[in-house]
Amino acid sequence: MLTLDKIYHAKFVLKQVARKTDLIAATRLCPGTDLYLKTENLQVTGSFKVRGAYYKISQLSAEERAKGVIACSAGNHAQGVALAATRMGIKSVVCMPDGAPIMKVESTKRLGAEVELVKGTYDDAHDRAVELQEQTGMTFIHPYDDELVIAGQGTIGLEILDQLPDVDAVIVPIGGGGLISGVAFAIKSLRPEVKIYGVQAAGAPSMEHAFHDHKYETLDSAVTFADGIVVKTPGETTFDMVSQYVDEIVTVSEDEIAAAILALMENQKLVAEGAGATPVAAALFGKLPLAGKKTVCLISGGNIDVNILSRVITRGLVMSGRKTNLMIALEDKPGQLSLVSDIVSACGANVVSVHHDRSDANMAITSCFLKLGLETRDAAQIETIKQKLTEAGFKLVTERA
């Protein structure tokens, strides 16, 4: 049974490996909201996961340590297990889905773990890890549905109360539920009036469904670029704790997560992975009642794969009205492009790409489609450009991001 004493013990044990991450005021992120960021993206291994993994492994018996540990993970828990096991001189094996970010796979190997890539999702990697555990007798280090792991994650709750004693609300990402279970238990045990909100990706809302349906259930599929929270089945222990200690769970879209990542980079100079940005997405897009509340967004990790970061930034620019593509029907005669360019320039936008299309079957023989890629200030400027083009007699055929 999880107790507050166990979380305090985890805090003592973790002093030798995990850092007390900064809690910073997000003064430029969400005007009108008293927002703070708990920067677990700056934690050892770039994620909160080292807390639970290290505390769990530290409590193993000598016999268990001799046999080694095994885990399954999309990346962050893998790195936490690898680091903890290596520091204690214990063999570690980690099963990871084959779609896990290359950066996380390679980092796990560098930290000393033996990695086995498993075709499919996290759940498939979990099944393989359980199979290997039964064959080898190694201790399975569950990423979230384990009391000691939850206790380790709960140390973040103690730190938040220490760093911001008058906090009113905390927003926490949810995958399997280990992080929010520990944080909620710690905070509610000491300050029961503090609101604890959870956030999931709309494409992987396993705990959100279970929470609102009041029953433990499994999704048919879970798809999101926020790989750290792609879980089809929440934990049984965590579901019970979330049902008891969490006040509300909401979901955010892929575009909203991308916009939050961009906002954190531009306004706070912080790099967050998809999962870590979900609390900020919930705040930015008004998913929760935060007015008048001192609110902490828990940035759970910063291990985003650079191969997808550029796409995420592009999506974030589109969501924030900083980038758009327009398609305009033109008469195919000299001077038309110049007229369009003058209008765009007068509105203060920047043309970054131009393409003429004379082959579309839907256009008149004497016409062409002009496709423009624009850099803009915001959504209002985009609307002004459209209005000016329409007033000048140009027809906007379609618009694509």
Regions found by a protein language model. Name each.
Residues M1-A401:
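PLP-dependent amino-acid enzyme catalytic core
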